[in-house]
């Protein structure tokens, strides 16, 4: 098995170093080590992750660092409880040592991750791991990665994704990034920059300098481009930003107000809402021809469009029924149907990558809520609430949402929560932060 991975971000804007990670499958026997994540997990699986052993100072340090990131990813998912290394009975310095499963059962571990880091003659490092079912003594999955030393964090996220998938049966979401709006300064003179980070808050950097306010960044399906809205001299402009090259391209300089540009699933179009004639409608722009087509035609305000993952339908927010509600229509603008009928006002609908749910923001009784419902409007579930919670964005596996929360003092922070409503956690950022957008799994 071979996987080609790219995307080690440098501190300089737009520079990216290609990373080749060669993956070898270690022989395995499938064991029945399973977490059912569809119902919500209240009792995380106890998992032991001893330090990956190395043969010199560099590889030993990397082994410790890799285990730290893998542990944080898995623990942060809410599905796993990483056991305290002080309780470990057996040492596993490398893969040649056979686990004594009775020792791991004695500390109540259900899963065991064993690994090593080996320097190669060409300066690269081989990082290998095995996931064991402690009760059966069977190997669940094993992989080996060949990589440069400065790409250890990327490899760590990939390992965590492999473990997550092996136990849950679904794709992980750790080898991803988040773009967001970094906010500084007083509320009367707010500076809003485009920023990017790994999903765990590492590798933070700014993409714009703050000279003009930025809003609503969104990733392309390849995770290589971002579309966002910027106000320059009070004129809204929609840009495309290439993360790999650092090149910024003006997509359009639109009269009136423009809101929430977002890519189509095939990456060939951008959908947005524009107020061209004093009325806000939804438009779609073909990135190949730069031609726009109008999708809605109604005297109400239509905004916040989001494609279904197959591109055949669009969900959006409209007040055509009197109050703000969520609607679904075909990709050509036909067949408009209202799907939200609960109390309160609904906003910012966004379709899950799985296609099974639409997340939303809801305002009711002076409180804000983040929730999700099925595309037909059934099964509405509130996941969290607060003074102001807004801007949900999906992890690529459709199992976790990220959003921003503002307290009564105006401080904004990023948070994530499981789609079942468990495991809300704050994501650390160097400044206040809002309007997150989650990338697909990195190529």
Swiss-Prot record:
UniProt GO BP: cell division; protein import
Compositional bias ranges of the Polar residues kind: 423-432
Main subcellular location: periplasm
Top-level taxon: Bacteria
Region (Disordered): 423-443
Coiled coil: none
The entry's keywords: Cell cycle, Cell division, Periplasm, Signal
Cellular compartment(s): Periplasm
Signal sequence bounds: 1-31
Listed GO CC annotations: periplasmic space
Complex and partners: The Tol-Pal system is composed of five core proteins: the inner membrane proteins TolA, TolQ and TolR, the periplasmic protein TolB and the outer membrane protein Pal. They form a network linking the inner and outer membranes and the peptidoglycan layer.
Family classification: Belongs to the TolB family.
NCBIfam families: propeller_TolB
Cited HAMAP family: TolB
PANTHER family for the chain: PROTEIN TOLB, PROTEIN TOLB HOMOLOG
Function of the protein: Part of the Tol-Pal system, which plays a role in outer membrane invagination during cell division and is important for maintaining outer membrane integrity.
Protein name: Tol-Pal system protein TolB
Originating organism: Rhodospirillum rubrum (strain ATCC 11170 / ATH 1.1.1 / DSM 467 / LMG 4362 / NCIMB 8255 / S1)
Name of the gene this protein is made from: tolB
């Amino acid at each position: 098995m071979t996987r080609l991975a790219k995307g080690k971000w440098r501190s300089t804007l737009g520079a990216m170093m290609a990373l080749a990670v060669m993956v070898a499958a270690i022989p395995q026997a499938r064991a029945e080590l399973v977490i059912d994540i569809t119902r919500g997990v209240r009792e995380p699986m106890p998992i032991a992750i001893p330090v990956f052993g190395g043969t010199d100072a560099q590889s030993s340090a990397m082994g410790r660092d890799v285990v730290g990131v893998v542990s944080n990813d898995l623990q942060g998912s809410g599905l796993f409880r990483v056991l305290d290394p002080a309780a470990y009975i057996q040492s596993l310095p490398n893969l040649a040592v056979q686990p004594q499963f009775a020792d791991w059962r004695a500390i109540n571990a259900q899963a065991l991750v064993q690994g090593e880091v080996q320097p190669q003659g060409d300066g690269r490092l081989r990082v290998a791991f095995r996931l064991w079912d402690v009760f059966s003594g069977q190997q669940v999955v094993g992989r080996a990665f060949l990589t440069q030393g400065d790409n250890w964090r990327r490899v760590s996220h990939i390992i965590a994704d492999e473990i997550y998938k092996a136990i849950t049966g679904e794709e992980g979401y750790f080898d991803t990034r988040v773009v967001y709006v970094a906010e500084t300064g007083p509320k009367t003179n707010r500076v809003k920059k485009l920023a990017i980070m790994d999903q765990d808050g590492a590798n933070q950097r700014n993409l714009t300098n703050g000279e003009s306010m930025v809003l609503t960044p969104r990733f392309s399906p390849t995770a290589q481009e971002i579309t966002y809205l910027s106000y320059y001299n009070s004129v809204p402009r929609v840009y495309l930003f290439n993360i790999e090259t650092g090149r910024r391209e003006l997509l359009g300089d639109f009269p009136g107000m423009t809101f929430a540009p977002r890519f189509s699933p095939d990456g060939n179009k951008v959908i947005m809402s524009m107020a061209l004639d004093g009325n806000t409608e939804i438009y779609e722009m073909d990135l190949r021809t730069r031609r726009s087509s109008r999708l809605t035609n109604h005297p109400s305000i239509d905004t916040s469009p989001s494609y279904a993952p197959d591109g055949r339908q669009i969900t959006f927010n409209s007040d055509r029924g009197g109050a703000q509600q969520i609607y679904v229509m075909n990709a050509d603008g036909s067949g408009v149907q209202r799907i939200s009928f609960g109390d309160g006002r609904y906003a910012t609908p966004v379709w899950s990558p799985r296609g099974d749910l639409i997340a939303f923001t809801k305002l009711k009784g002076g409180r804000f809520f983040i929730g999700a419902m099925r595309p037909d409007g059934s099964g509405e579930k509130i996941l969290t609430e607060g003074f102001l919670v807004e801007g949900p964005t999906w992890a690529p596996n459709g199992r976790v949402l990220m959003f921003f929360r503002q307290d009564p003092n105006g401080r904004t922070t990023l948070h994530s929560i499981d789609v079942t409503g468990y495991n809300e956690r704050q994501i650390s950022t160097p400044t206040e932060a809002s309007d997150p957008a989650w990338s697909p799994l990195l190529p």
